[in-house]
A protein has these predicted regions:
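Conserved NTP-donor binding/palm subdomain of two-metal-ion nucleotidyltransferases/polymerases, i.e.
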Residues: 1-127, 133-362
Length: 362
């Protein structure tokens, strides 16, 4: 368990790296060598090691990490920069592939498009490349275009697909927004079609914002979330908030019933990441502490969550363990998006009952 003082020191470094400026108060420093090791481990867990590294540069030299750890960190950042350069190079090739006649329009989601908003874009940890093709038909055409190059494409159950190109994972998506309950999906589909028809290389500011916020909700529900996703949300919103129609955003949040979720993530980026409250697209009075505690516990994709131990062997034991983990996530998620969670649980129960009957028959 990380103590509160170390969390506050971590957040100071994170804010300094995120916004590229020194904080006035740095009362939690200096740190001991062991505490610096914990800071590094926390950064890896939250996948913000590049941002924390940048934040360290604003500390006096005598307060920076021990030389050995700093060298290790610098090597990791050098590798991160190399990864980003590889991705940027591949991004220059993709328009050539999909631009061949008949052209297949796409939008770049998240990733390198978001990195451009950071003070040091090359220090954002890059994942896979996400491409959005507007609908299922166009996504399948894109899949076939890639297969024509001799590349194997894996198709998922929800209509998404993935493959590796030049050693980099790429995903194709037929949808932009991660909301799935039938009562709003038709409205979301129509809105997505309107957005995609604008034929921009990246989503519009409001589409980008809603993509990120609903994607974070999905990760909270299914896996776990790290601070990197909130950093992405904060720097993107800071750069694009002037292009967001606040009345349109509020209407969408009412229709999709995600207003409370939007408000709690706004509260989180203000209280912990230093986003200027006066620049929020809507006011918030939500308490972000429970959500932030979940972020501390789970880390990126939930890989750092140690609360429930490893999944045990055996079909039923494994299912029971998964249920314990998911119930914890659902309780928290239900506070912020009850309609989405209720539908998800109903749909999941239907699928699991079918799965159990299949298991028993085998």
């Amino acid at each position: 368990m990380v103590d509160e003082r170390l969390k506050q020191a971590f957040l100071v470094l994170l804010r300094q790296g995120l916004w590229g400026k020194k904080e006035v108060e740095q009362t939690d420093f200096p740190l001991t060598p062991d505490e610096w090791t914990q800071i590094y481990e926390m950064a890896v867990k939250q996948t913000v090691q590049g941002i924390i590294y940048d934040g360290i540069s604003f500390l006096p030299k005598e307060q920076q990490p021990p030389r050995g750890l700093l060298i290790q960190w610098t090597v990791a950042i050098d590798q991160l920069e190399r990864m980003n350069r590889r991705q940027n190079k591949l991004l220059g090739i993709l328009p050539q592939i999909f631009g061949q006649e008949p052209a297949i329009p796409f939008q770049l989601l998240k990733g390198q498009g978001i990195a451009a908003f950071y003070p040091k874009p090359m220090h954002r940890l890059c994942g896979d490349i996400d491409l959005y093709f507007g609908n299922e038909t166009q996504t399948e055409k894109a899949n076939q275009r890639i297969e024509s190059l001799g590349v194997r494409v894996e198709r998922g159950q929800l209509g998404d697909s993935s493959y590796a190109l030049n050693g980099i994972e790429i995903e194709h998506h037929k949808r932009l927004i991660d909301l799935y309950r039938p009562s709003v999906r038709k409205a979301v589909d129509c809105w997505e079609a309107e957005q995609f028809a604008k034929r921009t290389l990246v989503p519009s500011p409001i589409a980008n914002h809603l993509l990120q916020s609903t994607h974070i909700l999905k990760h909270l529900l299914l896996q776990g979330i790290g601070l990197r996703q909130f950093c992405d949300l904060a720097v993107t919103l800071k750069a694009q908030v002037a292009g967001i129609d606040r009345q349109e955003l509020e209407e969408i949040c009412r229709t999709w019933k995600i207003g409370k979720w939007q408000q709690v993530i706004y509260a989180l980026i203000v209280q912990y990441l230093g986003f200027p409250e006066e620049e929020l697209p809507m006011k918030t009075h939500e308490n972000p502490a429970p959500l932030m505690e979940e972020v501390w516990q789970t880390g990126n994709f939930g890989h750092g969550d140690e609360r429930f131990g490893n999944r045990p062997d055996g079909f039923w034991k494994g299912k029971a363990h998964t249920l314990r983990v998911m119930l914890n996530k659902w309780r928290l998620s239900f506070r912020y998006a009850p309609q989405e969670i209720s539908w998800y649980l109903t749909d999941l129960a239907r699928k699991r009952i079918k799965e159990l009957f299949t298991h028993e028959s085998n």
